[in-house]
Amino acid sequence: MKKILLSQVWFFLSVACYAQRSYKDSIQNYLKNYVDSHEVVKGEDRKHLHFFDVDPKYRVVAKFEKVETAQWFEMPTSGKIKKVFKQYGVLSFTINDTLIKMNLYQSQGLMGSDQYKNYLFLPFTDATSGIETYESGRYIDLLTTDIKNSEVVVDFNKAYNPYCAYVSGVYNCPVPPKENHLMVAIRAGEKSYSKH
């Protein structure tokens, strides 16, 4: 009986380790593709792109609540041009024993495009901003089709810097609204660009 129980425990531990390794491998591949296909940072400069170690605890299943009555508004950017968004919904989840709520946005400019009409935008700052990560915040992209049964997976290991992190004065990068200023440290995703 003990042997059967031990073999079952060993089997489940092996499956869990494989799943975690497989997840980390998939994120490593995602990040490699991100670096290799970067539209702003090219060639030798790509060695200045850095990331936190992949950590599964920063992949969360968030509760999603759609905001049906949201109005379009101008989100400030790093430049002179403001971009128009509306709040698509509210995400709720826990990281490091802290309940977090974030607003998820939809871009008016992208809604007219067949390719990008389902894109959702999650800009944020956190306790690492300006220390380990870009001072003005980072972004995560989601799709409306990612939301299932009022839940959506938010993977901070995929958090990336806006183009303004690499080149100043050229791009109009949305500034994360204060509702998405997190007090916790999100040690996942892209770090500060080291060429500056």
Where are these regions (language model features)?
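A structural detector for beta-sheet-dominated domains
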Residues: F52, V61-K63, T94-N96, N103-Y105, ...
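Residues that act as N-cap/strand-start positions at coil-to-secondary-structure junctions
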Residues: G43-D45, V54, F85-Q87, Y134-S136, ...
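Surface-exposed peri-terminal alpha-helical interaction modules
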Residues: K66-E74, K82, N96, L142
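Mid-length scaffold segments of soluble, non-membrane domains
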Residues: K80-S136
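Acidic, glycine-rich flexible loop segments
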Residues: F121-Y163
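Start-of-domain marker
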Residues: R21-W72
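Extended, aromatic/histidine-rich regions of cofactor-dependent oxidoreductases associated
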Residues: R21-K24, Q28, Y160-H196
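Bacterial Sec-dependent N-terminal signal peptides
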Residues: M1-S22
